[in-house]
């Protein structure tokens, strides 16, 4: 960062504004302003809120615009750039703008963790997570977004920003116990998902074969960073399962999963396996002939961690089916 700041300082014209769009730790804008060593150049924090798979829509139709500055003049100059954008503009300090982005991602991670915990409770009590999330989602105080149970959460933002926020809190002498437990519970949920695979395959099978559909952390992206799908398969690799995986965006071996074979199509992936785990919610999977898939498997067990299919329909065509919270 220091090299970049020096380059900026050497080329910007007087009375320029340096706008930071990245997600950065609390206090970064103040550090950049000091490192620039120029009183005629000013830093503004303007974090982006683009989600992978929806970046164009989020850019053209933002839910809000956050502008953090240390003076009204500079925040208003940046706000003028968005004068034709139909979205609320929130003016704040540097610190608030930086904290807003981290807080948003950490809150969504916490929301997913809560729903995954409720999904586990549903499995124990006989309730159905789909009914529960529908029932609470109509409450406008809660909403319907980020309410889908799954194998765990990951991606390029949630793990990083949640960890960063706990570190910032710790640096100020505050133990952010709620968020620390959120991160810990997500790891336990990933363990729980891997354990479901182990329980579904008969113990007397020596060469336990698992097929996995989906490797990216969510549909609509090729991003594998901290993917819950990859994290679950890592756990199975350590248990010596024979794993074959398919993802429409992945071609060839993955260094993250050295023991996992990558199939060219979903049917070949499932053939001869003892369990099929759906780990990413690609829409393409809904179009496949699942009866053909079931017939091709050695043991037609289906672990649907994204609740892509309906249990009664999968059982009708011959699967032993387990979803998340169903």
Task: Describe the residue ranges of each PLM region.
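Structural/interface elements that position substrates and couple domains in central-metabolism enzymes
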Residues: 1-326
């Amino acid at each position: 960062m220091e090299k970049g700041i020096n380059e900026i300082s050497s080329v910007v014209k007087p009375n320029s504004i340096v706008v930071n769009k990245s997600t950065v730790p609390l206090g970064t804008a103040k550090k950049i302003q000091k490192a620039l060593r120029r009183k005629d150049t000013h830093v503004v924090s303007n974090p982006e809120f683009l989600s992978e798979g929806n970046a164009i829509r989020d850019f053209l139709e933002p839910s809000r615009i956050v502008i953090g500055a240390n003076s009204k003049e500079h925040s208003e100059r940046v706000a003028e750039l968005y004068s034709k954008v139909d979205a609320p503009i929130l003016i704040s300090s540097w610190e608030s703008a930086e904290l807003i982005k981290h807080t948003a991602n950490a809150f969504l991670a916490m929301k997913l963790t809560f729903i995954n915990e409720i999904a586990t409770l549903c499995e124990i009590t006989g309730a159905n997570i789909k009914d529960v999330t529908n029932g609470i989602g109509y409450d406008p105080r809660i909403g319907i977004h980020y309410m889908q149970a799954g194998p765990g959460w990951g991606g390029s933002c949630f793990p990083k920003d949640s960890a960063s926020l706990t570190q910032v809190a710790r640096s100020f002498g505050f133990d952010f116990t709620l968020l620390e437990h959120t991160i810990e519970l997500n790891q336990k949920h990933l363990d729980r998902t891997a354990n479901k695979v182990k329980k579904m395959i008969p113990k007397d099978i020596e060469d336990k074969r698992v097929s996995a559909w989906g490797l990216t952390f969510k549909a609509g992206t090729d991003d594998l960073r901290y993917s819950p799908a990859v994290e679950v398969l890592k756990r199975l690799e350590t248990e010596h399962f024979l794993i074959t995986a398919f993802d429409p965006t992945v071609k060839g071996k993955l260094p993250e999963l050295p023991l996992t074979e990558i199939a060219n199509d979903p049917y070949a992936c499932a053939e001869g396996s003892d369990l099929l785990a759906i780990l990413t919610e690609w829409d393409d999977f809904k179009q496949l002939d699942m009866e053909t898939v079931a017939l091709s498997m050695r043991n037609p067990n289906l672990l649907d961690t994204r609740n892509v299919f309906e249990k009664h329909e999968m059982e009708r065509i011959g699967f032993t089916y387990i979803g998340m919270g169903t």
